[in-house]
Amino acid sequence: MPVYHLATFECDVTPPLGHPLCGGWIEPARGVDDPLRALGVVLLGGDKPIVLCAVDWTGLRNEAFRQWRQALAEAAHTTPEYVSVHCVHPHNTPFADVEAQKLISAAKAPDSLDLKFFADCVRRCAEAVRNALPQAQRMTHVGVGTARVEQVASNRRVLGPDGKVKYVRTSATKNPEARAAPEGLIDPFLRTVSFWQNDKPLAALHTYACHPMSYYGDGRVSADFCGLAREKRRQETGVFQMYFNGCGGNITAGKYNDGARENRGILRDRIHAAMVAAWKATEKKPLHGWEWRFLPLRFQPRREPAFSEAESRKVLEDPKAPAARRNNAAFQIAWLRRLHIPIEISCLEFLNQRILALFLPGEAFVEYQLAAQKMRPDAFVFTVAYGDGGMGYIPTARAFLEGGYEPTVALAAPETEQQLLHVIEKLLSPKH
């Protein structure tokens, strides 16, 4: 009978003072309110080791994502396709795109990333994996639990009577009319997958779909309310905790948050309460092994002139353009130059238990998460987004017609929706 083991790892990825935050689009690091972490688990005993990692950064794009994944794969003695790296997406944190930073340096634009700091984070995270493997503990059970989160998530896109976006409800929304509007389409549930050695909990992995910011732009580095809820839970239980962002591309706390400083603690406690409730509701099941499967997807680029390399190059090389616009142009060019490299969409299925974890790239809209659940109504579907963030937002095709913020910066074409849903359905299918 197979024997399964679980290793846990973590490393500090807090940037030094002065480091750009959110890709250089906001105030750089002026202080640290709480440290940033890269946290992960390694599942051992299957075909190949599987690595799941969550980083308290805004994002990892293109080559930055691939470098991080490759390093963890080598450390865990597996292949990159069996490694899933995701970002929690708080904004007072680094945003890494190695190729974009090289373009920025060549154009003598303000930096978006310290490449030496990034390489050091990758190296130390891989070292943490290597050090964790000898400490792996036997794993006998997997658990699942679900709890409703009260008064955190709301849809960012508030539509008017004409079907167009009337209000963009950002993470900190001060407009009383926008805040008074209904929550809109969200997934109100936090989901928890846990690993056990008989009655001893080894790790708890949580996911919830929402931008995790209470306030940002002040240069104060923080994992913000979702990371703080995770750490509060770890301190009170002594159990290793991870938090993943679900398909929160069009979801924020804007209905319940005006950016007041005290709201960070309030939102933290609401997420924490759901973590506690999901843990209490956990149902443990014997572990019969797992299957890891993945499919490649080649994303199609936007065709509008503003998204072309030629137009992006003009902005990048314009010394009079704002730093945020120049950096964004570099991100667009880096994306166009990697289109020949597909992105793997992954699924982890725990055999004979109807438990599936779906791992997606980018800032996927909540519609993808809800669609995945409808595809497998017989199963517990744990959806994680914010993997390779090269394409940025992944809206629905309809969203491009409705307007709003996300379609103005999404780098993949509207037909992405059909392509991605097709891949998700194949991965989640019992017949696969």
Describe every region a protein language model picked out:
Residues 1-240, 246-251, 256-266, 279, ...:
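Conserved beta-alpha junction segments in alpha/beta enzyme cores
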Residues 271:
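Anionic-ligand-binding alpha/beta catalytic cores of soluble enzymes and soluble regulatory domains
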